[in-house]
Amino acid sequence: MALKWTWARFDDLGVHALHDALALRCKVFILEQGPYQDPDGADKQSYHLLGYDEAGVLQACLRVVDPGVNYPEPSIGRVVTAKEARGNGTGRLLVAEGLARCQQVWPGRAVRISAQAHLQRFYGSFGFVAVSDEYLEDDIPHIEMLWTPPVVQG
Protein backbone atom coordinates (compact mmCIF):
# COMPACT_ATOMS: atom_id res chain seq x y z
CA MET A 1 0.00 0.00 0.00
CA ALA A 2 1.46 3.35 -1.03
CA LEU A 3 1.00 6.09 1.54
CA LYS A 4 1.40 9.85 1.40
CA TRP A 5 3.04 11.02 4.62
CA THR A 6 2.18 14.13 6.61
CA TRP A 7 4.66 15.11 9.35
CA ALA A 8 3.69 18.03 11.56
CA ARG A 9 3.79 19.47 15.05
CA PHE A 10 0.47 19.41 16.92
CA ASP A 11 -0.20 23.12 16.31
CA ASP A 12 0.43 22.68 12.58
CA LEU A 13 -1.74 19.61 11.97
CA GLY A 14 -4.95 21.38 11.05
CA VAL A 15 -8.35 20.37 12.33
CA HIS A 16 -9.04 17.75 9.65
CA ALA A 17 -5.75 15.89 10.14
CA LEU A 18 -6.13 16.08 13.92
CA HIS A 19 -9.65 14.69 13.65
CA ASP A 20 -8.47 11.87 11.35
CA ALA A 21 -5.67 10.90 13.75
CA LEU A 22 -7.82 10.98 16.88
CA ALA A 23 -10.65 9.08 15.17
CA LEU A 24 -8.29 6.29 14.06
CA ARG A 25 -6.61 6.14 17.46
CA CYS A 26 -10.00 5.95 19.21
CA LYS A 27 -11.17 3.21 16.85
CA VAL A 28 -8.15 1.06 17.68
CA PHE A 29 -7.09 2.00 21.20
CA ILE A 30 -10.54 2.47 22.73
CA LEU A 31 -12.99 0.35 20.74
CA GLU A 32 -10.66 -2.56 19.88
CA GLN A 33 -8.37 -2.64 22.91
CA GLY A 34 -10.62 -1.45 25.72
CA PRO A 35 -11.45 1.92 27.20
CA TYR A 36 -8.74 4.27 28.37
CA GLN A 37 -8.06 7.93 27.74
CA ASP A 38 -6.13 8.26 24.49
CA PRO A 39 -5.55 11.99 23.90
CA ASP A 40 -3.21 13.25 26.59
CA GLY A 41 -0.96 16.20 27.29
CA ALA A 42 1.90 14.64 25.33
CA ASP A 43 0.09 15.15 22.00
CA LYS A 44 0.77 18.88 22.21
CA GLN A 45 4.51 18.25 22.68
CA SER A 46 4.88 15.88 19.74
CA TYR A 47 5.36 15.49 16.05
CA HIS A 48 2.60 13.49 14.37
CA LEU A 49 3.14 11.24 11.36
CA LEU A 50 0.04 10.41 9.32
CA GLY A 51 -0.10 8.07 6.33
CA TYR A 52 -2.95 8.57 3.85
CA ASP A 53 -3.88 6.21 1.03
CA GLU A 54 -4.58 7.27 -2.56
CA ALA A 55 -8.21 8.07 -1.66
CA GLY A 56 -7.12 10.43 1.12
CA VAL A 57 -8.16 8.05 3.92
CA LEU A 58 -5.87 7.88 6.95
CA GLN A 59 -4.47 4.33 7.19
CA ALA A 60 -1.69 4.73 9.76
CA CYS A 61 -0.30 7.21 12.23
CA LEU A 62 2.05 7.60 15.16
CA ARG A 63 3.37 10.38 17.33
CA VAL A 64 6.90 11.22 18.39
CA VAL A 65 7.00 12.86 21.80
CA ASP A 66 9.76 15.40 22.34
CA PRO A 67 12.78 14.39 24.44
CA GLY A 68 12.32 15.22 28.12
CA VAL A 69 8.53 14.81 28.14
CA ASN A 70 8.10 11.07 28.79
CA TYR A 71 11.73 9.93 28.52
CA PRO A 72 15.13 11.58 28.04
CA GLU A 73 15.00 10.43 24.40
CA PRO A 74 12.36 11.17 21.76
CA SER A 75 9.70 8.49 22.08
CA ILE A 76 7.50 6.91 19.45
CA GLY A 77 4.01 6.05 20.59
CA ARG A 78 0.35 5.76 19.66
CA VAL A 79 1.43 3.62 16.70
CA VAL A 80 -1.76 2.62 14.90
CA THR A 81 -2.88 1.15 11.60
CA ALA A 82 -6.45 0.94 10.38
CA LYS A 83 -7.90 -2.58 10.51
CA GLU A 84 -8.13 -2.73 6.71
CA ALA A 85 -4.44 -1.75 6.39
CA ARG A 86 -3.06 -4.52 8.60
CA GLY A 87 -1.13 -7.50 7.32
CA ASN A 88 0.29 -5.80 4.23
CA GLY A 89 3.38 -4.08 5.62
CA THR A 90 1.75 -0.75 6.46
CA GLY A 91 2.91 -0.94 10.08
CA ARG A 92 6.48 -1.60 8.96
CA LEU A 93 6.36 1.39 6.61
CA LEU A 94 4.97 3.56 9.42
CA VAL A 95 7.64 2.67 11.98
CA ALA A 96 10.47 2.94 9.42
CA GLU A 97 9.22 6.37 8.36
CA GLY A 98 8.88 7.41 12.01
CA LEU A 99 12.46 6.42 12.78
CA ALA A 100 13.70 8.25 9.67
CA ARG A 101 11.82 11.41 10.72
CA CYS A 102 13.30 11.14 14.23
CA GLN A 103 16.78 11.09 12.72
CA GLN A 104 15.98 14.18 10.65
CA VAL A 105 14.89 16.13 13.73
CA TRP A 106 17.28 14.61 16.31
CA PRO A 107 20.25 13.19 14.35
CA GLY A 108 22.13 10.46 16.18
CA ARG A 109 19.67 10.30 19.08
CA ALA A 110 18.30 7.03 20.42
CA VAL A 111 14.51 6.53 20.36
CA ARG A 112 12.53 4.91 23.18
CA ILE A 113 9.15 3.20 23.03
CA SER A 114 6.73 1.68 25.49
CA ALA A 115 5.72 -1.25 23.29
CA GLN A 116 2.82 -3.58 23.80
CA ALA A 117 4.60 -6.77 24.89
CA HIS A 118 3.15 -8.92 22.10
CA LEU A 119 4.84 -6.58 19.58
CA GLN A 120 8.36 -7.00 21.00
CA ARG A 121 9.52 -9.13 18.06
CA PHE A 122 8.03 -6.64 15.55
CA TYR A 123 9.91 -3.70 17.10
CA GLY A 124 12.98 -5.87 17.58
CA SER A 125 13.10 -6.33 13.80
CA PHE A 126 13.89 -2.59 13.54
CA GLY A 127 16.70 -2.89 16.08
CA PHE A 128 14.76 -1.96 19.23
CA VAL A 129 16.11 -3.76 22.31
CA ALA A 130 14.13 -4.45 25.50
CA VAL A 131 15.42 -2.33 28.40
CA SER A 132 12.82 -3.15 31.06
CA ASP A 133 10.81 -5.97 32.48
CA GLU A 134 7.22 -6.33 31.34
CA TYR A 135 4.75 -4.00 33.09
CA LEU A 136 1.08 -3.06 32.81
CA GLU A 137 0.06 0.19 31.16
CA ASP A 138 -3.69 0.74 30.80
CA ASP A 139 -4.12 -2.95 31.78
CA ILE A 140 -2.10 -4.05 28.72
CA PRO A 141 1.34 -5.70 29.12
CA HIS A 142 4.10 -3.39 27.83
CA ILE A 143 7.87 -3.37 27.67
CA GLU A 144 10.25 -0.43 27.30
CA MET A 145 12.51 -0.71 24.26
CA LEU A 146 15.36 1.43 22.97
CA TRP A 147 16.54 1.95 19.38
CA THR A 148 20.04 3.24 18.80
CA PRO A 149 20.85 4.60 15.34
CA PRO A 150 23.52 2.75 13.40
CA VAL A 151 26.97 4.29 13.51
CA VAL A 152 27.84 5.77 10.13
CA GLN A 153 31.41 4.99 9.13
CA GLY A 154 33.15 8.07 7.77
Feature-to-residue mapping (PLM):
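C-terminal "cap" of GNAT-fold acetyltransferases
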Residues: 114, 136-154
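Conserved beta-strand in the GNAT
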Residues: 50, 57-67, 73-80
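A conserved beta-turn-beta hairpin within the catalytic core of GNAT-like acetyltransferases
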Residues: 67-76, 86, 105-109, 139-141
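Conserved GNAT acetyl-CoA-binding A-motif
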Residues: 95, 102-115
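Short amphipathic alpha-helix that is part of the acyltransferase structural core
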Residues: 1-58, 154
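Conserved acetyl-CoA-binding loop-helix of GNAT-fold acetyltransferases
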Residues: 81, 87-100
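Conserved active-site alpha-helix within GNAT-family acetyltransferase domains
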Residues: 117-134, 138-141
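A short beta-turn/loop motif at secondary-structure boundaries
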Residues: 39-44, 68, 136-138
